[in-house]
Amino acid sequence: MDRTSRFNTLDNSTQGWINGFIGVVIFSGSLPATRLAVMEFDPVFLTMMRATIASVFALLLLWLFKEKRPARNQWVPLGIVSLGVVIGFPLLTALALQYVTSAHSIVFIGLLPLATALFGVLRGGERPRPVFWLFSMLGSVLVMGYALAQGLSAAPAGDLLMLLAVLVCGLGYAEGAKLSRSLGGWQVICWALVVAMPVVVPLSVTLAPASFSGISLPAWLSLGYVALFSMLIGFVFWYRGLAQGGIAAVGQLQLLQPFFGLALAAGLLHEQVSLGMVLVTVAVIGCVAGAKKFAR
């Protein structure tokens, strides 16, 4: 019986890491796609429009599967998720990308695991072992060191916006993961999108440009990606992974996101991928493995 119980726990944890990894891969395209989109869309309109599109599909999913409304005590946590990942993070990153390059902004995402783990402790009641924090801090330092090695930003406003984006996103991730244990992974992001509808839908209409005739196909495709994949599909996998494998543990997979994102930026925006990126990626993978081992 004990052996079966251990196997089920291990299997659930492994599934959590797989789901979390899929979510990270999807999220990795968010900043390069946003960078392409803000070249032609106003950043505030882009944020509201991506949430509006995603919320329509979210409402459709909830209706098709006849999901029950959340309990009264779940609406406030859903509001926190909505403010963090539906509005806060997309808006702050879109504004930041007016000041800094896609590659520069991506490396700040390396701080997300630490932010998620901190809020996982504060909001989710998790208690990782001390060695976990060592690997988490080391991974974050490696990513930030890589960012600094590329040169300090000439636009501190962009850096500040990215740091704020990381904080609100970490809070939204941790709150959503905690809520997904009782509400369900995809249900959390869907209801969070629905909560945001009274704000994002009217603003999308109000802030819409007078004409869309000058918008290129890459900009439209980027809007579609951040609306459907970054805002909805990615979270289905991500929240399920966090709930299965633990917020602090699976959250360490975010350390890989900057490097996936840089690879996409190189392909989409023709930015150079250096040997240093490859070396730091290997080191960060080691930190992720160490964090996973000592997370519980």
What kind of region is each of these model predictions?
Residues 2-48, 91, 151-178, 199:
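Glycine-/small-residue-enriched transmembrane alpha-helix faces in small-molecule transporters
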Residues 25-26, 30-31, 59-109, 145, ...:
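Specific transmembrane alpha-helical segments of multi-pass solute transporters/efflux pumps
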Residues 25-55, 101, 171-195, 209, ...:
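Juxtamembrane helix-loop-helix junctions in multi-pass membrane proteins
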Residues 29, 33-36, 40, 54-71, ...:
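Membrane-interface helix-cap regions at the ends of transmembrane helices
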Residues 48-49, 90, 104-111, 175-198, ...:
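Helix-helix packing/entry segments at the starts of transmembrane helices
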Residues 58, 111, 119, 128-150, ...:
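Hydrophobic transmembrane alpha-helices of multi-pass small-molecule transport proteins
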Residues 58, 116-118, 122, 136, ...:
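Transmembrane alpha-helical segments that form core, pore/gating elements
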